[in-house]
From Swiss-Prot:
The gene is obg. It comes from Tropheryma whipplei (strain TW08/27). This is GTPase Obg. Keywords: Cytoplasm, GTP-binding, Hydrolase, Magnesium, Metal-binding, Nucleotide-binding. Monomer. It is found in: Cytoplasm. It is an enzyme of class 3 (hydrolase). InterPro entries: G_OBG, GTP-bd, GTP-bd_Obg/CgtA, GTP-bd_prot_GTP1/OBG_C_sf, GTP1-OBG_CS, GTP1_OBG_dom, GTP1_OBG_dom_sf, OBG_GTPase.
Length: 445
């Protein structure tokens, strides 16, 4: 039909997420009448906004990510005088379809957002910098500096939608899968008499007797689907979560051997790699449906149907001859599917979140020397570098004290560092001078 544009179905995208930067702390001094310097009153910066993914039943595809491939949360506001802390950056909540799996750049699965409302923080906002009021202490009564806010996390993630259905209808193109799901549920897929009419999974809810379950009409598979031929991997992905596999066979097609076709589809299912703790696709409960019996008119065609039923019953317990057009055999077929779905557990397995507890004896920094430069790496020292305003000598002195308390100066002495050697921390190069009072580092220019 001309003049109609079907909505695009997108089930795999790569997206960049950037959390908000933390606001800078404020360095200010309270001034009162008769007390021109009444003490520090600089507020701290607000934390940057974080980004969350949330499973939403109103979303069906990832097409919105195709149009917008980068999401950013807002920054935290800077601190102000009179002890006014900066406002926190606004968090960003991004909706995704239920059944969205999230992977990092290395291909490791981070989460599986299956249940409606399930939420995942993908990037965390940067910490706001402390104002000079928070930095004041017995050594520094009135600091003339504040800490800078930290940048927010940045990540590139791959999102994949896998249909959440109890039953998957599989088979070659044009065997009548869309007609079946239209007949047994309220789903209204596009139906036409040519191959690859269905280009994305159609989901339908079936109510048969006391049973209620969901069915997915998976686009037609071809030989080599498990290796990606004919968008096979994209299609097979949507079968991963199903409990029951229904092979739909066109018993009126005289140009294709139904038995060899069944074996070929089974081979593709067996070669598709599922999650480690999931049942292989070819090992799950299966039902064979011989569709389009309304087309069979001659005695020869009827005899062929009986022959196919006898052959397939040797391979599979449940074999049904149906017609999606006349609805013949659908009642018995849908009731049996309900029984199987109730008997076998769902393959939907949300990813559990693991909390990693750091080892007690993990060193807080490491020191090595390459190309004549001592390089210090570690979460704390690199974080402190980002927090330092290098235009302030007092801020640099404060940084040096923190590095010294962490044990970096002693480590440099043990490593054989001498006055004038270069030390790199977090991309910033210092000149080490152990003779300088109160600080062992001077910033190289």
């Amino acid at each position: 039909m001309s003049g109609i544009t079907l909505p695009e179905f997108v089930d795999c995208v790569t997206v960049e997420f950037s959390a908000g930067r933390g606001g800078d702390g404020c360095a200010s001094v309270r001034r009162e009448k008769y007390k021109p310097l009444a003490g520090p009153d600089g507020g701290s910066g607000g934390h940057g906004g974080s980004i969350f993914l949330k499973a939403d039943t109103s979303e069906r595809t990832l097409i919105s990510f195709r149009r917008k491939g980068h999401y950013s949360a807002s920054n935290g506001a800077h601190g102000l005088s009179r002890l006014r802390n900066g406002a926190r950056g606004k968090d960003l909540e991004v909706s995704v379809p239920c059944g969205t799996s999230v992977y990092d750049e290395g291909g490791r699965q981070i989460a599986d957002l299956v249940s409606p409302g399930s939420c995942l923080q993908v990037v965390r906002g940067g910490t706001g910098g402390l104002g000079n009021a928070a930095l004041a202490g017995y050594r520094r009564k009135t600091p003339r500096f504040a800490l800078l806010g930290l940048p927010g996390q940045k990540r590139k993630l791959r999102l994949e939608v896998k249909s959440i259905a109890d039953v998957a209808l599989v088979g070659f193109p044009s065997v009548g899968k869309s007609s079946i799901i239209s007949a047994i549920s309220s789903a209204k897929p596009k139906i036409a008499d040519y191959p690859f009419t269905t280009l994305h999974p159609n989901l339908g809810v079936v109510q048969s007797g006391p049973y209620r379950y969901t069915v997915a009409d998976v686009p037609g598979l071809v030989e080599g689907a498990s290796k990606g031929i004919g968008l096979g991997l994209n299609f097979l992905r949507h079968i991963e979560r199903c409990s029951v596999v229904v092979h739909v066979i066109d018993c009126a097609n005289t140009q294709q051997d139904p038995i060899s076709g069944f074996n070929l589809i089974e081979k593709e299912l067996s070669e598709y790699k599922v999650a480690e703790n999931a049942i292989p696709l070819n090992k799950r409960p299966k039902v064979i449906v011989l569709n389009k019996i309304d087309v069979l008119q001659t005695k020869e065609e009827q005899d062929t149907l009986l022959y196919l039923q006898s052959v397939f019953k040797k391979l599979v317990t449940d074999v049904y001859a149906i017609s999606a057009v006349t609805r013949s055999g659908l009642r018995q077929f849908t009731l049996r599917l309900g029984e199987i779905c109730q008997e076998y557990p769902s393959q939907v397995q949300p990813t559990s979140q693991t909390i990693l507890i750091p080892a007690k004896n993990t060193p807080e920094f490491s020191l090595d020397r390459t190309d004549g430069v001592y390089r210090v790496t570690g979460k704390k020292p690199e974080k402190w570098i980002l927090q330092t305003d290098f235009s302030s000598d007092e801020a640099i002195s404060y940084l040096a004290e923190r590095l010294d308390r962490l044990g970096i100066e002693d480590a440099l002495v043990r490593a054989g560092a001498t006055c004038g050697d270069e030390v790199e921390i977090g991309g910033v190069i210092f000149t080490w001078d152990p003779s300088v009072a109160n600080t062992s580092f001077s910033l190289s220019v």
